[in-house]
Design a protein with these regions (language model features):
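Conserved ABC ATPase signature
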Residues: 131-135
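ABC transporter nucleotide-binding domain
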Residues: 175-270
Length: 333
């Protein structure tokens, strides 16, 4: 059975098509990753699925309920944790969860047990009576996650759950997400800028760009489709010679795909060790000098670049700049 069903969904803002005729299904108990550059349509899609925005056309069901005609029932069956941490830093951890319990109309006789259970799961029992203002960023994010779990939703939506956190804290959050998934068996729909995060957590991922779904599959299947090996090399820029070289490389038997980024060229191949000597021969014939070359295994970053022509790294850097700017404004206030 499917926890989420999207059929021919579109959303337009005036003449802008933010989401264009997308369809996808997410199975019950699945962890599904939704990836895309800024402006690709992923945030708009998530807002529609969480009933914060109405679609222009098409249909979406979440937990068996229509997001437009049965919005109230959808909200009763989902948890939504936003990108920005939304806990009250002047309340204690426990007080924050009590507030969330009341907002979600959890029966009074269940509140204490639920809160104790969640605090133990995210390892905040010892800190529950301390003001959140004393918590680290990772602790605040864990508390934020806990607030989205108290009413035990069937589907948990996570918008960039670890953005802005250091790598050690991100990995700790991944551990908690796995614990949450294993304990409650809930469906998790997450958007993320971290390829490693999607690779580690998700059963399947969908890549959206320009409002359209580009591909949906498991991370491993996507990587396998690119080829067994990735050849990355740099050359001195000469647009005409470079274009001719790329055309010839595409004709090599074992080459599956090729992308470019400035002076860098990335070749996806089933037999990289056999393709590299041919690349050197072709470069020499065009009078092109190869400055550096490497042979690696394909990553989810490579998959993303293959489908969108862009990296997600810039998106994360933009978020960090916005966060730093907001921090400086608070200090000046």
């Amino acid at each position: 059975m499917n926890a989420i069903e999207i059929n021919s969904l579109s959303k337009e803002f005036g003449k802008i098509k933010a989401v264009e005729n997308i369809s996808l299904e997410v199975k019950e108990g699945e962890i599904f990753g939704f990836l895309g550059p800024n402006g690709a349509g992923k945030s708009t899609t998530m807002m529609i699925l969480t009933t914060l925005l109405k679609p222009t056309s098409g249909k979406a069901l979440v937990a068996g309920y229509d997001v437009v005609s049965q919005a109230k029932q959808v909200r009763q069956n989902i948890g939504y944790v936003q990108q920005e941490i939304s806990v009250d830093e002047y309340l204690t951890g426990r007080e924050n969860l009590i507030l969330q319990a009341r907002l979600n109309h959890i029966p009074k006789h269940l509140v204490k047990k639920r809160i104790d259970e969640i605090l133990e799961l995210i390892e905040l029992t010892d800190k529950q009576n301390e003001p959140v203002i004393t918590y680290s960023g990772g602790m605040r994010k864990r508390l934020d996650l806990a607030g989205g779990l108290l009413h035990q939703p069937k589907v948990l939506f996570l918008d960039e759950p670890t953005v802005g956190l250091d790598i050690q804290t991100r990995r700790k959050i991944w551990e908690y997400l796995r614990k949450i998934h294993d304990k409650f068996g809930m469906t998790i729909f997450l958007s993320t800028h971290y390829m490693e995060e999607a690779d580690n957590l998700c059963d399947r991922i969908g890549i959206i760009d320009y409002g359209q779904i580009q591909v949906i599959d498991s991370p491993q299947t996507m990587k396998n489709a690119l080829g067994n090996e990735v050849i990355t090399f740099t050359i001195s820029n000469n647009d005409e010679k470079k274009s001719n070289l790329i055309s010839k490389i595409k004709e090599i038997e074992y080459v599956k795909d090729i992308t470019t980024n400035g002076e860098g060229i990335t070749v996806f191949s089933s037999k990289g060790t056999e393709v590299i000597p041919i690349i050197f021969q072709l470069s020499s014939s065009f009078g092109i000098k190869i400055n550096s070359i490497s042979l690696t295994q394909p990553t989810l970053d490579d998959v993303f670049i293959s489908y969108t022509g862009r990296e997600l790294r810039d998106e994360t850097e933009n978020f960090n700049k916005r966060r730093e700017h907001a921090k400086m404004k608070r200090l000046r206030a």
